[in-house]
Amino acid sequence: MPVPPTLSLDAFAAAKLAGLDAAGLRRRLVPTARTGGARAERDGRAVVSFSCNDYLGLATHPEVVAAAHAALDRYGAGSGGSRLVTGSHPILAELEAALAARKGHEAALVFGSGYLANLGVTPALVGAGDLILIDELGHSCMWAGTRLAGARALPFRHNDLGHLEDLLARERARARRALILTERVFSMDGDRAPVAEILGLARAFDAWTLVDDAHGLGVVGPDATAPLEMGTLSKALGSYGGYLCASRPVIDLLTSRARSFVYTTGLPPASAAAALAALRLIEAEPARAARPLALARRFTARLGLPEAQSAVVPVLVGEAEAALALSRALEARGFLVVAIRPPTVPPGTARLRVAFSAAHEEAEVDALAQALLDLGAAA
């Protein structure tokens, strides 16, 4: 008698989960409530969080929260439709204009998330017969968009300008169009791409460049501006959503061609209003933006690590189980520093990803550094 489909599906899932358990790679949801500043309650335990991407502490800023409340009261909870039907509410137009101005571009387009932005932009611009050159450590959503595009895709070694130039010299003439993908700040390593130099190579070989600025906006100082500047509203801006800034013709094309924009509901008014308020605070309070990097550098100096380039500092551990054990030991001491394991990072490079916020106190940073030293996790 054949096995009912639901039973075979459950058996498949159970076998896969057993494999993940054996490798220390199973993921679990843990209830976590932010309680003010950099503090949180994690599964009932009070902790200082060093795993939150709210780099400027704006998610709970009174002006940001008030803007979200006002939009909620005026426009309701949801946008009511896709952007091309009824979901393009007035706050989105304001937000897009502010993002474009911040990035020095003519226009911007807000997506449902940063992941959706990368998922939609690349396939809308390149396809079969074209070439994509992507940094090997590019975010998962950059790779997902690359695969959807159907173009020939070649990774270049991380931040290796020589390798990128070699690939362009060898492959560019075979393709109609070429697109280079990189991140301004790499999310798991915290290092920065040589954007100006990449743009120079792009000009020399008639290639376009998309820079993912998800972890840079509002945290690291401006550098060269790419023709395609993508980012998120969920990190330094403390809200939710994604965006692309570009020329007006490119934005107009994406409005019609980016499937992850066309076929999804518009961002809720409250999320857009919160992001807009946060963006205005960043413009008005430049000192706030300098604090996460300063704290990150204080931390790396105390641990003898290479000087931080961003608000993200990796503490490399190696194997997944060891990273999990170190994370648990820190949590027992009152610090939330989540272990990052494959496939998010390459095998053998499991780590603690330490994220710094303007909401952290220097004493909290020093205490975390000392805890890591006490646990033998740093030099």
Swiss-Prot record:
Positions of substrate binding: R27, R34, H139, T344
InterPro entries given in the database record: Aminotrans_II_pyridoxalP_BS, Aminotransferase_I/II_large, AON_synthase_class-II, PyrdxlP-dep_Trfase, PyrdxlP-dep_Trfase_major, PyrdxlP-dep_Trfase_small
For this UniProt record, give its keywords in alphabetical order, as a comma-separated list.
Answer: Acyltransferase, Biotin biosynthesis, Pyridoxal phosphate, Transferase
Q: Which Pfam families does the protein's record reference?
A: Aminotran_1_2
Q: What is its EC number?
A: 2.3.1.47
Q: Which reaction is recorded as catalysed by this protein?
A: 6-carboxyhexanoyl-[ACP] + L-alanine + H(+) = (8S)-8-amino-7-oxononanoate + holo-[ACP] + CO2
User: Binding of pyridoxal 5'-phosphate: at which residues?
Assistant: G114, Y115, S187, D212, D213, A214, H215, T232, L233, S234, K235
Please give the family membership noted in the entry. Belongs to the class-II pyridoxal-phosphate-dependent aminotransferase family. BioF subfamily.
How this chain assembles, per its entry, is: Homodimer.
Briefly, what is this protein's role? Answer: Catalyzes the decarboxylative condensation of pimeloyl-[acyl-carrier protein] and L-alanine to produce 8-amino-7-oxononanoate (AON), [acyl-carrier protein], and carbon dioxide.
Q: What is this protein's name?
A: 8-amino-7-oxononanoate synthase
What organism is listed for this UniProt entry? Answer: Methylobacterium sp. (strain 4-46)
